[in-house]
Amino acid sequence: MKKILVHERFKEDWIQVLTHIANLFFENSKLYESIDNPDLSVHFQYKKENNVYSTACQLEVDGKTFDSTYSKEYDTDGTEREQNIRMKRALSHVLLDVLEQYTGIKQQWGILTGIRPTKLYHKFRKQGLSRDEIRAVLKKDFRVSDEKISLLESIVERQLATIPDLDEIGKEVSIYIGVPFCPTKCAYCTFPAYAIAPNRKTGRVATFLDALHIEMREIGKWLKENDMKVTSIYWGGGTPTSIEAEEMDALYQTMYESFPNPENIREITVEAGRPDTITPEKLAVLKKWGIDRISVNPQSYTDETLKAIGRHHTVQETIDKFWLARNSGMDNINMDLIIGLPNEGIEEFQHSLDETEKLMPESLTVHTLSFKRASEMTRNKEKYKVADRATVARMMEMAQAWTRENGYYPYYLYRQKNILGNLENVGYSKLGEESIYNIVIMEEVQTIIGIGCGAASKFVHPETGKITQYYNPKEPYQYILAFEGAIEKKIEVLNALYALHLTK
């Protein structure tokens, strides 16, 4: 752990932001007001005069000093909260600069440590800034590289082409339905995912599905009564194809009966990520209900890697199930690859890209491994040897080159804390094959109603954009006990959120 002495007394939220900046350079760091023998020593100066925010930073390490200054003038006074954000950004700016000087590491995302950088781009776009003006702000005030700004520009262009009414889509809602079962739990996973076999034995799968039917009907009833339009539906989890074909059939029937005007829903996706759950019978059910967007996720095309991360299927099974789905009429298939999996380097990732090229799915999501706190991989980090920062960055470059050469375009992006190399996860697709749900959830432009185990509801105020969240219980037994209360709570929030909107 890097021990960093900060000679000023800062507010807790300032320390938190500066710690995020330090962690871009060091795997783990902690800022102290007082400590003996620090690894780094940092002096800050800052002031606000009228609407001008000025900061300076000096880093002392190993007898060397590194200096940086920054100043920005704003047109308006801003609220107290906005003033606080402005100063945190100004302090982040100079700390990032001195750490880049010291380490020689250039942070491509600059001071942006949040999950959704495209959301910031859309904010500037809605404020009326031109493309050139947005580029200048991102470069000067956020220190984002030209390469990443170009990536954001490409993504926003695809999003607006896919959803021309993106700025008005807050009048509609999308729905996420969580089925929390998987054949096994992967080592990197923190989603609500429970091995299906033991839950089947205890009867918990059947009881959960009974509750899920009820929740779908009750939420659907509210949507119909309030004449709400549904943009998209996403079945996730877990792996929703872990259950039997007959159980899937019954759920989709309830979906079509419960939600308003299903023929007008723009997109329905079913996450079939684990190839070992895909069967001809289940594919037939999907086709019966007009669902042709699914995910078949290899993650890697190296059997040893799959074994190491707890995915109990083979590479060949992934390939076979892809073609089974394709020959069953599935014409919009997504596949996922993960950069930085244990014991994988340039050679293994190139092999994964070569194998993907033989399949050519409609979309490809390239994830960078993130050490999430609750995952098996994080709890036992010493067991899993992963690539260094330079290798991970090279693999991301390989993915970008491969997608360009094969006619895929980036259309959504998100980042995570503790992600290898401070990189990003990017969704690519062939033109016209973009996922509507992925765009609306990443850009937080409309309410997502979460149904099922561990499902997160994200309520976006249709006029102010203010976001509130509600989480269903993660564990199946707790969900079974509490789902009725969860339904009541969500309907209560929906009534309050849309009361004014629905009476207009």
Model-flagged regions — what are they?
Residues Y102-K106, K126-Y176, N226-D227:
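N-terminal [4Fe-4S]-dependent radical SAM core
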Residues A193-M398:
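Conserved non-cysteine loop/helix-boundary elements of the Radical SAM core domain that shape
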Residues P240, N418, G454-S457:
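Short, glycine-/Ser/Thr-/acidic-enriched flexible segments
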